[in-house]
């Protein structure tokens, strides 16, 4: 499925929704549920995040306007299709997100076919509307694969999950196939405490296409200022481990990822990254957990919930004295009003060494996001 086809599919549902065509039949047959979210805000950053070294840049952003339709029929079948629209400075982009059909078998066993997220990384699998920070960590953005075309089988119990899939990148089908798998388990899971452990791995075929990791260092509208070496690659191996601990109002998560990439000439290059993040709720609330993921907060009080967030993320994209090493320290404050409105304020302090684009890679950044779910 090419990009243009994805855009058309994503927004073809809009007139159907407006006419009320998507609804339950009321007879226990096919049912449909329409939902989505709008995330918008402001990014302000210094020379670090600008490849030309501009000292001060401010952008209004539409981080994502997502529309999602979930279908279910019979006792075992379901499907989902969603599309998103983003505005990043002068750039506007519409794309197809998930588009799959799924069969649910006995004992929580499921088979999925279509386009969806590969089973890799706790943070990557978490919806943007459920994140604690303004963006996913630099490590997740750099390493964890996103949505691809494929087929996947998995089992999703409340305290343990596993998934295995065969995929092809719909944006670059010439890159070949990938095999990706993830397992997770919560050996401790009670009303007040959760301990989550997980691991994932992926083998990826590149067919001697150009390979380079590029990242905007956790600011959506910034330039891709953190980069690895660029070369033609044959294949890569990706691995990650993850852990999470929730105790009453406190939630701590961490992931470490490593990727080995084989160049056309046969030598292997190695890149690594990771993050640790903590969130402390100042109100009498806690983040729920289910089936290998920490979910979004639903405040108990009509006055909402407040959360303090801190994160440190780092990547080492440097090998053979080529590429960059970078880190970002983030502090933030979140406000949750009901289950549908979230306000995120982040302050980011980045550092970089090795090869860099900006002539003066200094200056911090601030981001503000308003997320509304419907």
Regions found by a protein language model. Give the residues of each.
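Bacterial N-terminal signal peptides that target proteins for export
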Residues: 1-9
């Amino acid at each position: 499925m090419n990009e243009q086809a994805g855009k058309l599919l994503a927004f073809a549902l809009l007139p159907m929704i407006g006419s009320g065509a998507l609804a339950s039949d009321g007879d226990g047959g096919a049912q449909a549920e329409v939902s989505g979210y709008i995330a918008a805000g402001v990014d302000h950053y210094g020379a670090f995040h600008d490849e030309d070294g501009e000292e001060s840049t401010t952008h209004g952003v539409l981080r994502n306007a997502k529309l999602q339709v979930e279908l279910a029929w019979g006792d075992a079948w379901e499907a989902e299709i969603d599309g998103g629209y983003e505005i990043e400075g002068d750039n506007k982009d519409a794309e197809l997100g998930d588009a799959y059909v799924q069969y649910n078998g006995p004992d929580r066993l499921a088979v999925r076919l279509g386009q969806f997220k590969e089973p890799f990384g706790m943070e990557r699998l978490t919806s943007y509307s459920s994140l604690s920070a303004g963006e996913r960590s630099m490590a997740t953005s750099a390493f964890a694969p996103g949505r691809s075309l494929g087929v996947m089988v998995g089992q999703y119990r409340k305290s343990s999950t596993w998934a295995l899939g065969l995929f092809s990148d719909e944006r670059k089908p010439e890159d070949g196939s990938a095999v990706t798998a993830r397992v997770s388990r919560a050996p401790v899971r009670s009303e007040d405490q959760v301990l989550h452990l997980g691991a994932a791995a992926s083998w990826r075929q590149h067919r001697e296409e150009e390979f380079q990791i590029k990242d905007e260092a956790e600011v959506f509208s910034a330039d891709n200022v953190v980069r690895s070496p660029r070369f033609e690659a044959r294949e890569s191996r990706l691995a990650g481990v993850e852990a999470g601990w929730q105790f009453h109002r406190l939630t701590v998560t961490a992931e470490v990822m490593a990727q080995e990439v084989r160049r056309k000439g046969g030598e292997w290059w190695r890149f690594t990254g990771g993050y640790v993040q903590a969130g402390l709720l100042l109100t009498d609330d806690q983040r729920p957990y289910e089936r290998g993921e920490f979910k979004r907060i639903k405040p108990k009080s009509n006055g909402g919930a407040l959360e303090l967030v801190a994160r440190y993320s780092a990547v080492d994209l440097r090998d053979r004295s080529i590429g960059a090493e970078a880190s970002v320290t983030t502090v933030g404050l979140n406000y949750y009003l009901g289950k549908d409105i979230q306000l995120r304020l982040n302050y980011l302090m980045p550092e970089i060494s090795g090869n860099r684009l900006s002539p003066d890679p200094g200056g911090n950044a601030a981001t503000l996001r308003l997320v509304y779910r419907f």
